[in-house]
Amino acid sequence: MSQCPYQASQVDLSDEGVHWDQDISYGQYLDLDAVLKCQNPRSDKHDEMLFIVIHQVSELWMKLCLHEAHGAANSLMAGNLSTAFKMLTRVARIQEQLIKAWEVLVTMTPADYAIFRDDLGQSSGS
């Protein structure tokens, strides 16, 4: 049986530690109260929550994609190619996540969507 490949690490972590800010929790840092209140279905149909969450998550991924693309452009202009490459690699991974998100959405059939589509008004593309 082989040993864990990380067991004999050459990295000295003796001066590393977990840095805790006692004044802020994980939920506070991420502003989870606000984020989790942003899903407001217009109907009582079960699948509308899926529709909302998938689209909100996609918007957040796209926001991060733009943030990384701008950072990469700034790094390129500064001649920092390795940082730009890292950021562009991150953009590619974000795009992979966006594509994978559709695998969840396709579990909702067109008939499922049609049940609450009228409740979305003009936001539904109608």
Residues covered by each model-derived region:
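Surface-exposed peri-terminal alpha-helical interaction modules
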Residues: M1-S126
